[in-house]
Each structure stands twice: as structure tokens, then as C-alpha cells.
Curated annotation (Swiss-Prot):
Pathway: One-carbon metabolism; tetrahydrofolate interconversion; Amino-acid biosynthesis; glycine biosynthesis; glycine from L-serine: step 1/1
EC main group: transferase
GO function terms (MF aspect): glycine hydroxymethyltransferase activity; pyridoxal phosphate binding
Catalytic activity reported: (6R)-5,10-methylene-5,6,7,8-tetrahydrofolate + glycine + H2O = (6S)-5,6,7,8-tetrahydrofolate + L-serine
The protein's role, per its UniProt record: Catalyzes the reversible interconversion of serine and glycine with tetrahydrofolate (THF) serving as the one-carbon carrier. This reaction serves as the major source of one-carbon groups required for the biosynthesis of purines, thymidylate, methionine, and other important biomolecules. Also exhibits THF-independent aldolase activity toward beta-hydroxyamino acids, producing glycine and aldehydes, via a retro-aldol mechanism.
Any Pfam family matching the protein: SHMT
Organism phylogeny: Bacteria, Pseudomonadati, Pseudomonadota, Gammaproteobacteria, Moraxellales
Cofactor(s) in the UniProt record: pyridoxal 5'-phosphate
Provenance organism: Acinetobacter baumannii (strain ATCC 17978 / DSM 105126 / CIP 53.77 / LMG 1025 / NCDC KC755 / 5377)
Protein name: Serine hydroxymethyltransferase
Subunit note: Homodimer.
Superkingdom classification of source: Bacteria
Length: 417
């Protein structure tokens, strides 16, 4: 029998680290595009007794007994995911977005097959063919990028590379791209060369669910996403697909037993909650505000003389180039962190600096919008960021901005005390 003892009583050192993180989340402004704040209900599910249950297999086809209730939970998550995204198939077991992506590769490809994906340096993801990832080591990865003049995806290059290399699979999706992706254009290119079309919509899944960004699910052969970011659920993954019995069978076996063992039932329950939350009118209004806030911030930076890659944004994020300011992304990240504004350094297209230094920062609005920030607050925030960068990290400017950040964070708490 376990003693009824708290973390602070049992492990004060760990409790202090957790408390410090709690304080950081409340007292700092979060602008990392892939981060958000999930609801108390989502966190409650993740801390439930479901964490104790092993459930290898799928609902009704488990390798362990005692799964009658987790079967209900997983089927609920599956049904809600299909309804939310208009999918014919859903697998809610992937532990994360990268695991979902690796399962797709395992299901549809053989080692050495050619994959055409977006370059990491131009806004793609590690799992889209980067050399340091399994996707670039196991498969023959060919990379496309952005048009140098527009800062948007170079679809002509995508088509040229597809015709030249005849990939088995084309990957559409991104981790740092601010415009609407033409999913149908990718579909047409894939069909020309007989390739699968795989869409990774991890960054925009919440926008898609709310109908403020085009839905790729019935266009692509397979679509994956994380369940955090704009979807505002637990840190986990999801695979979706349109009807295709052969692909569905391959995906099922690629996730289990191909890529994972037992599913995380506490996380799956949390996904079921976040899918239900995403069906609400409040969630739709939230996603609309996320985009409005990102566009408002981009406008301020442009007015202050900064270059925004592609000239603006249609979603929740944008890349701010600091080449003209002769500031590195690494320095800007550090200066803003000292002012309690969290961003991440990010390479910009054709960046002359290394990925560890970079010439830009990525800014996203999902978390600040969850806090309740509207256009007025984010415009003011963008001005503070520009002040810090323009000052080249002047200590007085940082201190002044930090005080303003603390005041606005107190006005807009993440969680009610």
C-alpha cells in the first residue's frame, strides 16, 4: 500500500524544480510555435490510474486481459478523431509526432526508397528527410525548398524534383512555414509520378479542426499530427487516413507491433478529451484569434523595419529574419529570454549562419492566445521584442521590458489560482 505522501514531502528537490517550471510558465510569455497550455481536464487524464494499464494491441484485440475499459476509452478517442478531421481511419496510439511519422515510413516504404520532403533549412521537419534523422538515413531523401523571391514553397521545384527522382512518397508539411500549403497541388504532383502523398499537419492541426486552414485528410493518402501545438492536447501523436483498406492494415501493423509496444492509455484518454474540446465553438473562436494575433504581430515587425519570411502569415507562426539587423537568432533568443519572453532561434532560408546560431527567430501565437491575449496585447508585445533586439540586448531595455511582461502575465494568468 502506498503512503499518502506528496511529491514535496517525498522528493523536495524534484518538487522545487516542478514549482519553478510552474512559476516560469505563469511569469514568462510563451512564443514558441510548437508549445501551448493544455486544459486541466487533459492534465487530469494524464495523471490518472490509466497510466498503470498495459494494453498491447487494439480495442477488442488485446494481448492482455483487463482491457474492457481502456477499449472503451481508445475507441472513443478514435471515433472523435475521425469525426473532428473527417477521416475514415484513425490510429491514436503513436507516442509522439515523430513516432507517427516513422510508422508511416515503415508502412509505406522499404529501406532505400526515395522520399521527397521539405528541407529542414527551409522550414521542414527532421522527419521529412533530414540527414540526421532516420528519415534521411534509412531512405534516399531528396529535399525541396522555398522560392527565393516569394519565400513560399516552390511548387515548380517540387514537380521538377518529383519528375527527376520518381519518389515513392512525397511529404508535405512543415515546422516553420507561415503560408497556406496547396495540398491539392502536392496531390497532383504525387499522382504524376505514382507516389504516395503523406501530409504532416502537426503545426496546423488545431487550425484545420476549426476550419480556418485547409484540411488535407481526404487529399493525402496518410496524414499525421501531434496532439499538442495548436490542437492544445497532450504531447502525443495521431495518424489519420482516407478510406483504403490496404493502407489501413499497413498502418495498424506499423504502429503495433512494428514501431511501438504498449500504448499510453493515460495519454490516449487525454487525446479523447482534447478532441472533444476541439469540437466546441469556443475552440473555433480561439483558432481564429490565433491567426489574427500572428498577423497582427507580423504587421508590427514589418512596420519596425524587420523582414518577415514570405512577407506575412496565414497561420499561427512566422519567421523573423534578423540578417538586416546583423543580430543572430541565438543572441535574440537569449536577450528575449532575459526579458521573460520565450522564443526559439531558427534558420531562415539560405541562412549564412549555422543551425546552432541562425539568423532568425520563430514566433508563434497559440500559447499567448490561450492566455487571453488579443491583437492589442500582441501588438504591444511585438513592439517590446523589437525594442530588445534593436537595443542589441541593452540591460536597461531588457529590465524595462521584463517589468512590462511581468505585469501583463499577472493580468492574464494561464491557470486560475
Amino acid at each position: 500500500m502506498f503512503a499518502n505522501i506528496s511529491i514535496s514531502e517525498f522528493d523536495p528537490e524534484l518538487a522545487q524544480a516542478i514549482a519553478s517550471e510552474d512559476e516560469r510558465q505563469e511569469a514568462h510569455i510563451e512564443l514558441i510555435a510548437s508549445e501551448n497550455y493544455c486544459s486541466p481536464a487533459v492534465m487530469e487524464a494524464q495523471g490518472s490510474k490509466l497510466t498503470n494499464k498495459y494494453a498491447e494491441g487494439y480495442p477488442g484485440k488485446r494481448y492482455y486481459g483487463g482491457c474492457e475499459f481502456v477499449d472503451v476509452i481508445e475507441q472513443m478517442a478514435i471515433d472523435r478523431a475521425k469525426e473532428l478531421f473527417g477521416a475514415d481511419y484513425a490510429n491514436v496510439q503513436p507516442h509522439a509526432g515523430s513516432q507517427a511519422n516513422s510508422a508511416v515510413y515503415l508502412a509505406l516504404l522499404n529501406p532505400g526508397d526515395t522520399v521527397l520532403g521539405m528541407s529542414l533549412a527551409h522550414g521542414g521537419h527532421l522527419t521529412h528527410g533530414a540527414k540526421v534523422s532516420f528519415s534521411g538515413k534509412t531512405y534516399n531523401a531528396v529535399q525541396y525548398g522555398l522560392n527565393a523571391e516569394t519565400g513560399e514553397i516552390d511548387y515548380e521545384e517540387v514537380e521538377r524534383l518529383a519528375l527527376e527522382h520518381k519518389p515513392r512518397m512525397i511529404v508535405a508539411g512543415f515546422s516553420a512555414y507561415s503560408r497556406v500549403v496547396d495540398w491539392q497541388r502536392f496531390r497532383d504532383i504525387a499522382d504524376k509520378v505514382g507516389a504516395y502523398l503523406f501530409v504532416d499537419m502537426a503545426h496546423v492541426a488545431g487550425l484545420v479542426a476549426a476550419g480556418v486552414y485547409p484540411n488535407p485528410v481526404q487529399i493525402a493518402d496518410v496524414t499525421t499530427t501531434t496532439t499538442h501545438k495548436t490542437l492544445r492536447g497532450p504531447r502525443s501523436g495521431l495518424i489519420l487516413a482516407k478510406a483504403n483498406e490496404e493502407i489501413e492494415k499497413k498502418l495498424q501493423s506499423a504502429v503495433f507491433p512494428g514501431n511501438q509496444g504498449g500504448p499510453l492509455m493515460h495519454a490516449i484518454a487525454a487525446k479523447a478529451i482534447c478532441f472533444k474540446e476541439a469540437m466546441s465553438d469556443d475552440f473555433k473562436a480561439y483558432q481564429q484569434q490565433v491567426v489574427k494575433n500572428a498577423q497582427a504581430m507580423a504587421e508590427v515587425f514589418i512596420a519596425r523595419g524587420y523582414d518577415v519570411v514570405s512577407g506575412g502569415t496565414d497561420n499561427h507562426l512566422f519567421l523573423l529574419s534578423l540578417i538586416k539587423q546583423d543580430v543572430t537568432g541565438k543572441d535574440a533568443d537569449a536577450w528575449l529570454g532575459a526579458a521573460h519572453i520565450t522564443v526559439n532561434k531558427n534558420s531562415v532560408p539560405n541562412d549564412p549562419r549555422s543551425p546552432f546560431v541562425t539568423s532568425g527567430i520563430r514566433i508563434g501565437t497559440p500559447a499567448v492566445t490561450t492566455r487571453g491575449f488579443g491583437e492589442a496585447e500582441v501588438r504591444e508585445l511585438a513592439g517590446w521584442i523589437a525594442d530588445v533586439i534593436d537595443s542589441k540586448g541593452d540591460e536597461k531595455v531588457i529590465a524595462d521590458v521584463k517589468a512590462k511582461v511581468e505585469a501583463v502575465c499577472a493580468k492574464f494568468p494561464v491557470y486560475a489560482k
